[in-house]
């Protein structure tokens, strides 16, 4: 059940729950960090190279045993705060179409820095499973300026275009400072209860930075206490996960992890994906599962 302001409740439009979209009980989601897209400062104009790299990374993730992936315009810095240009949406849709055709795992879309409408539109067009939204509710001070959540717009757009696309919302998102004094567990509850997010992400301060396990525990406990088993939104750890820390993330209450840097050759964020590193991390997850 989702609770609205004043204690009222309402049924959400039918969206396939995040937990049922993955074959694994504790999914490992890998990042496909797109090179700079056409129209961005660092782009060399080679569209074929962008698509080739995206497909190679997606296939390597799948070959390593990944449970899902997120396609993200990581190379587009400096990022537009929210409304990205139409050509960015077009490029991401074209690449996402090829990626979803090439792999047989759930795919998510993230349009940086915080264009949830664009991400949702791309996801709906290519039949992706979910979107990641950096600031879904609340306000964050970032290097793009002050970003405000637009949950009211995102949910209405999803309903209007009849998209079976789940919303995975960051709480106290990385590369940002939350405005106000809401605790991370309160922020997570508001993302779910008032923002109607289908799942939440807890991250460290930046890309590849370790996530505080205490924060994961607080968010997981808060959602567990408030929600029934059937409706409890999953909690994902969104940065700093490695083969050495993945078991600790699940022990802290995470339901899944999103991994980028640790799956790249040499553990460098901008390098290609290494299938071997993917396999090692998935094996570490599985070894922990078998020990339970």
List each model region and its residues.
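C-terminal helical cap(s) of enzyme catalytic domains, especially alpha/beta-barrels
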Residues: 145-153, 259-292
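Haloarchaeal acidic low-complexity proteome signature biased toward cell-envelope/secretome components but also
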Residues: 1-25, 31, 51-52, 228, ...
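Alpha/beta enzyme core
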Residues: 29, 34-82, 95-105, 114-232, ...
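A charged helix-plus-loop insertion that forms the helical arch/lid used to bind
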Residues: 85-92
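Alpha-helix capping and helix-coil boundary motifs
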Residues: 14-17, 45-46, 183, 270-273
């Amino acid at each position: 059940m989702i609770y609205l302001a004043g204690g009222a409740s309402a049924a959400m439009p039918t969206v396939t729950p995040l937990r049922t979209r993955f074959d694994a009980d504790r999914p490992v989601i890998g990042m496909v960090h797109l090179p700079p897209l056409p129209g961005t400062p660092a782009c060399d104009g080679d569209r074929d190279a962008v698509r080739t790299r995206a497909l190679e990374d997606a296939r390597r993730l799948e070959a390593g045993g990944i449970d899902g992936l997120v396609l993200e315009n990581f190379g587009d810095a400096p990022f537009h705060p929210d409304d990205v240009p139409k050509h960015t949406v077009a490029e991401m849709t074209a690449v996402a179409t090829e990626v979803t055709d090439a792999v047989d795992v759930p795919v998510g879309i993230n349009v940086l820095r915080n264009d949830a409408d664009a991400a949702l539109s791309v996801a709906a067009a290519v039949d992706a499973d979910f979107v990641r939204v950096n600031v879904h509710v609340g306000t964050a001070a970032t290097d793009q300026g002050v970003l405000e959540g637009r949950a009211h717009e995102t949910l209405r757009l999803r309903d209007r275009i009849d998209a079976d696309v789940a919303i995975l919302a960051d709480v106290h998102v990385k590369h940002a400072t939350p405005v106000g004094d809401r605790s991370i567990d309160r922020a997570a509850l508001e993302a779910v209860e008032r923002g109607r997010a289908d799942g939440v992400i807890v991250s460290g301060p930046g890309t590849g930075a370790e996530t505080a396990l205490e924060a994961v525990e607080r968010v997981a406990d808060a959602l567990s206490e408030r929600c029934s088993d059937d409706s409890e939104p999953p909690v994902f750890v969104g940065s700093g996960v490695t083969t050495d820390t993945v078991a600790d993330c699940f022990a802290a209450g995470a339901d899944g992890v999103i991994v980028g840097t640790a799956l790249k050759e040499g553990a460098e964020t901008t390098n290609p994906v290494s299938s071997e590193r993917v396999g090692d991390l998935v094996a570490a997850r599985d070894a922990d599962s078998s020990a339970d």
